[in-house]
Amino acid sequence: MEQEQDTPWTQSTEHINIQKKGSGQQTQRLGRPNLTQLMDHYLRIMSQVDMHKQTVSWKQWPSLKNPTQGSLKTRALKRWKSFNKQGWTN
């Protein structure tokens, strides 16, 4: 049987199954996660990333405690114009 190399992804998602041998000693076997476990892991990570993005975006706009539609539109247009001035040179 071919042994696969562990990666950070497999190490973080693999679950340890403990099996008892006939002599009473315990051995650990790393099992592959099922699809539900992978989806749970993915959704947990993505929700953490989303929360971080929301926090960062509000920290970038500290003056907007109660933004109006006009102020948001003005700010967005300024950002769009500055982006277009830079062009695709970056």
UniProtKB/Swiss-Prot annotation:
Site (Low pathogenicity): residue numbering on this chain: 66
Keywords assigned: Apoptosis, Host cytoplasm, Host membrane, Host mitochondrion, Host mitochondrion inner membrane, Host nucleus, Host-virus interaction, Inhibition of host innate immune response by virus, Inhibition of host MAVS by virus, Inhibition of host RLR pathway by virus, Membrane, Modulation of host cell apoptosis by virus, Viral immunoevasion
Cysteine disulfide links: none
Superkingdom of origin: Viruses
Region (Disordered): 1-31
Matching InterPro entries: Flu_proapoptotic_PB1-F2
GO biological process, one term: symbiont-mediated perturbation of host apoptosis
Recorded family membership: Belongs to the influenza viruses PB1-F2 family.
HAMAP family, per the entry: INFV_PB1F2
Miscellaneous section: Is not encoded in all strains, and seems to be dispensable for replication.
Function: Plays an important role in promoting lung pathology in both primary viral infection and secondary bacterial infection. Promotes alteration of mitochondrial morphology, dissipation of mitochondrial membrane potential, and cell death. Alternatively, inhibits the production of interferon in the infected cell at the level of host mitochondrial antiviral signaling MAVS. Its level of expression differs greatly depending on which cell type is infected, in a manner that is independent of the levels of expression of other viral proteins. Monocytic cells are more affected than epithelial cells.
Subunit details: Oligomer. Interacts with human SLC25A6/ANT3 and VDAC1. Interacts with host MAVS.
Protein name, per record: Protein PB1-F2
Taxon lineage: Viruses, Riboviria, Orthornavirae, Negarnaviricota, Polyploviricotina
